[in-house]
A protein has these predicted regions:
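Flavin (FAD/FMN)-binding glycine-rich loop and adjacent Rossmann-like elements that form
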Residues: 32-33, 45-52, 56-68, 72-234
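Conserved N-terminal/central alpha/beta ligand/cofactor-binding core
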Residues: 1-38, 110-116
Length: 236
């Protein structure tokens, strides 16, 4: 964060944030349980024009029209449905004439991570820091737990920690079924940690969804290559 410290909140806090946004604005309509499934596109002129979306509501498609449509799906689904070109997985070196990269695209994306928070619930609880090699953070601190000395750790004594959790592969992060499989796989990997924390007097707040690092990459007006980065080229 701006003060070089770590700040995070319990997963359920998003509900308070959403409520705060709705309360602050006079013209917001929130449609829960109505996932976007398609883009409404007009093909007039020399390019497609997105005029809204289709959502699934009560088992039926409902059209929502808008002068401006923003793809905030996180997966690039709406842009793809509107006909935008996109990439998925690692590119081959020859795709963009890069000097570094794979000879052939392997179609793989970065792995997914299931994060969680542990919180002390017993007065005699002792955090089992010895079982964690990396990936544990105190709130409002600069150092990882594993970087702290025993004295520093006991002095901070926050009693609540953010865990990077388990990392797993997902063969296709655009497919909700396969993402759910990865979610279950990550939960299984975390069971020993959950059990150890529970024995030590801690409860766990697991993230509502597995963290996806990479999905569709929508092609923009310019494709930034690895050589651009190496040469420190700036595009405005």
């Amino acid at each position: 964060a701006w003060d070089n410290k770590q700040h995070w909140w319990l997963p359920s806090s998003f509900a308070q944030v959403v409520y705060g946004i709705m309360k602050a604005e006079k013209n917001i309509t929130l449609m829960c349980g109505s996932p976007v499934v398609d883009a409404v596109v007009e093909t007039k002129g020399n390019r497609n024009r997105v005029t809204g979306v289709c959502v699934m509501r009560q088992g039926m498609l409902q059209k929502v029209s808008a002068p401006v449509t923003i793809d905030a799906t996180g997966t690039g689904l709406l842009a793809a449905k509107a006909g935008c070109e996109y990439f998925y997985g690692s590119d081959a070196r020859k795709d963009f004439n890069e000097s570094i990269g794979l000879e052939k695209s392997d179609g793989r994306v970065q792995p997914c991570t299931m994060m969680y928070i542990s919180q002390r619930t017993r007065s005699d609880a002792e955090f089992p820091r010895h079982i964690f090699k990396t990936g544990v953070l105190d709130h409002d601190q600069e150092k990882w737990v594993t970087q702290q000395t025993e004295e520093e750790f006991r002095k901070i004594d926050s009693g609540i920690y953010l865990h990077w959790g388990a990392t797993v592969e997902c063969t296709d992060t655009t497919d909700p079924v396969l993402v759910a499989d990865a979610h279950r796989c990550a939960m299984k990997k975390l069971e020993p940690q959950f059990e150890a924390l529970n024995r030590a007097g801690y409860v766990t707040h697991v993230a509502p969804k597995i963290g996806i690092r990479e999905c569709r990459r929508i092609k923009g007006e310019y494709v930034l290559t690895v050589d651009d980065v190496l040469l420190s080229l700036i595009h405005i």
